[in-house]
Swiss-Prot record:
Keyword field: Cytoplasm, Histidine metabolism, Lyase
Pfam families, sorted: Lyase_aromatic (PF00221)
Family, as annotated: Belongs to the PAL/histidase family.
Modified residues (2,3-didehydroalanine (Ser)): S142
Source species: Burkholderia ambifaria (strain ATCC BAA-244 / DSM 16087 / CCUG 44356 / LMG 19182 / AMMD)
Main location: cytoplasm
BP GO annotations: L-histidine catabolic process to glutamate and formamide; L-histidine catabolic process to glutamate and formate
Post-translational modification: Contains an active site 4-methylidene-imidazol-5-one (MIO), which is formed autocatalytically by cyclization and dehydration of residues Ala-Ser-Gly.
Gene that this polypeptide is encoded by: hutH
Protein name per its UniProtKB record: Histidine ammonia-lyase
Aminoacyl-tRNA synthetase is among the record's keywords: no
Length: 507
């Protein structure tokens, strides 16, 4: 059980919400603020004075006054008309994060929503009744309207859900959770819809995957150093301390730790080779830069996870209703775009190491890592697959945040595209996973070919894991299943856990 303290969520909590079957409860200390916000909205609605989002239309229709007897209909219509998402359902892990983030935002007491509505969301979450949310349809301002409308429609008994993974109607989902359809009061529909929770959830969910890939890439890169009989001298701490970048210093330390005591490395310590290619030698510089970007993105996304991104905002202590733009997800878009650059670069560097290993003139290994080259092609086309994926990632890494299209009759004339920026991270991460799987296979093959010398004590379990699932490549065979089984192990963090390094979300 995780107790949500609105405004004080942590990255480890968010990772657990996404990755584990934890349940949620709301910190009772938040109840007074929630109740005060709801009362403030009820008082404003009772007075009948125009207040945006409470008794007016929305967007370009903000100047249209809504009579008091139509306020409930206004909120219902808002939810139903905005549930216009398309595409595949959002991943279960992202939906869980989305609901938790929405609860945190509402729980800070500036949205004017009743606890009854929040309790219904928690009940659905804990019953594993998750809204079916189409993943496409948000431009990241005014908030993530369409995705959050699909979440909110379930509270009304409209739409679809997944009941413990099985697709069903919203009404069936409410019944399983022991709930009845809600009637939303003034502003409650808008409070549910307005916010950056979809883009932030997608960005966080994919960031956690990219963090795992980063750690896997450290391991794969270190194994490739041994496979290529590379030097460990470029990882000397003194080099990196002179430059001063924290990520670079930390990455170099990880490579030193992983390669410490390698018999392969000791066997060629006194060779006449002067310098390794950049894909080996400059790993701390490249991976360190990726690490710095990822850490900054995590800081931004944690702030956003704890933010109130509703509009308008209710200030119960003064009774004021202030319209602003906290729904504009530009910080999320920038963070996601930076994560895309890092994830694509992790894959790009791994692809270069694969290319190095299969090139006999660079690695000193048999061409394409196989004996009897010619009749056997070995890793030749596996590298082509890695190259295809790395190239695709370069296109996917183009920033989404530089684009904008005006909506709502030019009332909402600049948008963030944060949801797309966050969503495409999943494709980049998936591609990078397969690139790393191919590198792990190639590096393991190279290490085998360095016999009788072995890799380091820290990397020996990696070799054992790989060889426990895929045999040494002797002759050409149907190769795709080998890549698939190692990619599955990458997804399961089998190699990431070997890296002597952890992110804030894992602590």
């Amino acid at each position: 059980m995780i107790t949500l303290t609105p405004g004080h969520l942590t990255l480890p909590q968010l990772r657990k919400i996404a990755r584990e079957s934890v349940q949620l409860t709301l910190d009772p200390a938040s109840f007074a603020k929630i109740d005060a916000g709801a009362k403030a909205v009820a008082d404003i609605a009772a007075k009948g004075e125009p207040a945006y989002g409470i008794n007016t239309g929305f967007g370009r229709l903000a100047s249209t006054h809504i009579p008091h007897d139509q306020l409930e209909l206004l909120q219902k219509n808002l939810v139903l008309s905005h549930a216009v998402g398309v595409g595949e359902p959002m991943a279960r892990s992202s939906v869980r994060l989305l609901m938790a983030l929405k609860l945190s935002s509402l729980g800070r007491g500036h949205s004017g929503i009743r606890r009854e509505v929040m309790d219904a969301l928690i009940t659905l979450f804990n019953a594993d009744v998750l809204p079916l949310i189409p993943v496409k349809g948000s431009v990241g301002a005014s908030g993530d309207l369409a995705p959050l409308a699909h979440m909110s429609a379930v509270l009304l008994g409209v739409g679809e859900v997944f009941i413990r993974g099985e697709r069903a109607s919203a009404l069936d989902g409410l019944r399983v959770a022991g709930l009845a359809p809600l009637t939303l009061q003034a502003k409650e529909g808008l409070a549910l819809l307005n916010g950056t929770q979809a883009s932030t959830a997608l960005a966080l969910d994919n960031m956690f995957s990219i963090e795992d890939l980063y750690r896997t890439a450290l391991v794969a890169g270190a194994l490739s150093v041994d496979a290529a009989a590379g030097s460990v001298k470029p990882f000397d701490a003194r080099i990196h301390e002179l430059r001063g970048h924290r990520g670079q210093i930390d990455a170099a330390a990880a490579y030193r730790d992983l390669l410490d005591g390698s018999p392969i490395n000791q066997s060629h310590r006194d060779c006449d080779k002067v310098q390794d290619p950049y894909s080996l030698r400059c790993q701390p510089q490249v991976m360190g830069a990726c690490l710095d970007q990822m850490r900054h993105a995590a800081d931004v996304l944690l702030i956003e996870a704890n933010a109130v991104s509703d509009n308008p905002l209710i200030f119960p202590d003064t009774g004021e209703v202030l319209s602003g733009g906290n729904f504009h997800a530009e910080p999320v878009a920038f963070a996601a775009d930076n994560l895309a650059l890092a994830a694509a670069e992790i894959g790009a560097l791994a692809e270069r190491r694969i290319a190095l290993l299969i090139d006999a003139t660079l690695s000193g290994l048999p061409p394409f890592l196989v004996k009897d080259g010619g009749v056997n092609s070995g890793f030749m086309i596996a590298h082509v697959t890695a190259a295809a994926l790395a190239s695709e990632n370069k296109t996917l890494a183009h920033p989404a945040s530089v684009d904008s299209l005006p909506t709502s009759a030019n009332q909402e004339d600049h948008v963030s595209m944060a949801t797309f920026a966050a969503r495409k991270l999943a494709d980049i991460a998936d591609n990078t996973k397969y690139i790393l799987a191919i590198e792990l296979l190639a590096a393991a093959q190279g290490v085998d070919l360095r016999a009788p010398y072995h890799t380091s004590p820290k990397l020996a379990p990696v070799m054992e894991t790989i060889r426990g699932h895929v045999a040494h490549y002797e002759l050409d065979h149907y190769f795709a299943p080998d890549i698939a089984v190692i990619a599955k192990l990458v997804s399961e963090r089998a190699f990431a856990k070997v890296a002597p390094f952890s992110f804030a979300s894992e602590q």
